[in-house]
A protein has these predicted regions:
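C-terminal motif of bacterial Sec signal peptides marking the signal peptidase cleavage site
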Residues: 6-9
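N-terminal extension/subdomain marker
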Residues: 11-116, 384
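Terminal, contiguous helix-loop blocks that mediate binding/assembly
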Residues: 18, 113, 137-394
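Structural recognition of the beta-strand scaffold that forms the well-ordered cores
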Residues: 24-29, 60-65, 121-124, 174-178, ...
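Residue-level signal for short, function-critical loop segments
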Residues: 31-32, 67, 126-128, 366-368
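Surface-exposed loop and adjacent secondary-structure segments within mature catalytic domains
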Residues: 66-89, 119, 124-150
Length: 394
């Protein structure tokens, strides 16, 4: 189900640079947090090993692994007639903070120096909280590092804007996959639009088992890159199988996903700004009751993550205007899938409004007397200006 998507403003290697591999995919696994306690990183590495035979001969799948041992870089390999292995190709002599963008920078430098490639993919594996600043509550945006503590989630974390600044110094990525909660937010993708062609993620929480890598390694290396197939394989694992939260009972995991074509995000910002400036009142917040929201169950009142299509459908009063906006949205989000429910906070499932599901979340500025702190944080995003919110005084 290949999608021929547009071209971003990404930059590339100088043509004189040596290119050895067709594509190198790096999984940046920041596991010094509660996910390590559950050994979920080990399960996912095992899944990658199962799919080692799907890695093309002239491509590489690397893992930067920071768990409770010293950080190291692994190469997933399968030699003819032998079992797949995760070979250590680089080991760090001391502890690193994987929730620091400088660590991301040094890892990317090492990978690009030692595996020069025509294209790259990047997987962020950890906890995530979309566009919220790293100093906001809860205290993370992407990749928590608690040192050698694997019981909690209170350690260092990276702001998405800082991640974008670091990645801007490297060859344009073919894709970024967030195997982390809440990261398919339009504010996140817009921040990353110059450093990657595609963003694949969930607007909601990700179930503990995460991505089914044994299904997804093959499309990671597709040419042209097939982001829709990555989404489809991820979705199918949860839709086609009954995976019970406890191993018994009716509670079962679900997942919501989409792929964003970053070359279309400026057009989406323009179309959204047109509608925001036409339909948003400077003095009265939009009625948000009944619009699909994504949240941890323990924080059900959090208003950060509304389904973008659901919100815009409510906001735009003229059907012709909505159809026009939706046509731009569909180019920016060419493929989205969701089970009938989405997973939340270990043991609960929430129904998905499939009729209005867009697969991408957005923040909507709200009552200043209650949410002005969140509104203020939203004003620090690039999307706030691009999508017209500054112009209407929110």
């Amino acid at each position: 189900m290949s999608l021929l998507l547009g071209v971003t403003s990404c930059h590339w290697f100088n043509p004189d640079d040596e290119v050895v591999y067709d594509r190198t995919v790096l999984a940046y696994i920041a596991a010094e947090n509660s996910l390590s306690y559950g050994a979920f990183h080990e399960q996912d590495i095992d899944e990658m090993l199962q799919a080692a035979g799907d890695i093309p001969a002239n491509s590489r799948l690397l893992i930067y692994l920071d768990d409770t041992s010293n950080p190291r870089i692994l190469s997933i390999e399968q030699q003819s007639g032998r079992r797949p292995t995760s070979r250590v190709v680089h080991e760090y002599s001391e502890e690193q903070n994987s929730g620091d963008v400088e660590t991301l920078r040094t890892v990317m430098e090492w990978v690009c120096d030692h595996y020069p490639s025509s294209s790259y993919g990047l997987i962020f594996w950890s906890h995530g909280d979309a566009w919220l600043p790293a100093k906001a509550v809860p205290q993370r945006s992407i990749c928590i590092d608690n040192g050698r503590n694997n019981y909690s989630n209170s350690g260092s974390k990276m702001d998405i804007a800082d991640v974008a600044d670091v990645l801007d110094g490297f060859p344009c990525l073919e894709f970024i996959l967030f195997d982390a909660c809440f990261m398919q937010a339009v504010e996140v993708a817009y921040e990353l639009r110059h450093v990657t062609r595609h963003v694949i993620a969930s607007p909601a929480e990700i179930p503990n088992p995460g991505a089914p890598y044994e299904r997804m390694v093959k499309p990671f290396f597709s040419v042209p890159f097939d982001g829709a197939e990555v989404v489809e394989q991820y979705y199918r694992m949860y839709n086609d199988s009954v995976i019970s939260v406890f191993g018994y009972g009716s509670d079962r995991y679900g997942v919501s996903l989409s792929v964003i074509d970053c070359s279309r995000l400026d057009a989406l910002a323009d179309a959204t700004a047109e509608m925001v400036t036409k339909y948003v009142s400077r003095d009265e917040a939009t009625d948000l009751k009944g619009i699909q929201r994504y949240y941890p169950l323990s924080s059900k009142s959090r208003p950060e993550f509304y389904d973008m299509n659901g919100y815009m459908r409510r906001l735009i009063k003229d059907e012709a205007d909505y159809v026009r906006w939706k046509s731009v949205f569909d180019l920016a989000v060419p493929y989205a899938r969701s089970t009938a429910w989405w997973y939340s906070n270990d043991a609960y499932t929430q129904r998905v409004d499939l009729d209005n599901y867009g697969g991408v979340s957005c923040y909507v500025p709200q009552d200043r007397s209650i949410y002005d702190g969140l509104n203020e944080k939203f004003r620090t995003t690039s999307w706030y200006v691009a999508a017209g919110w500054q112009e209407v005084g929110w």
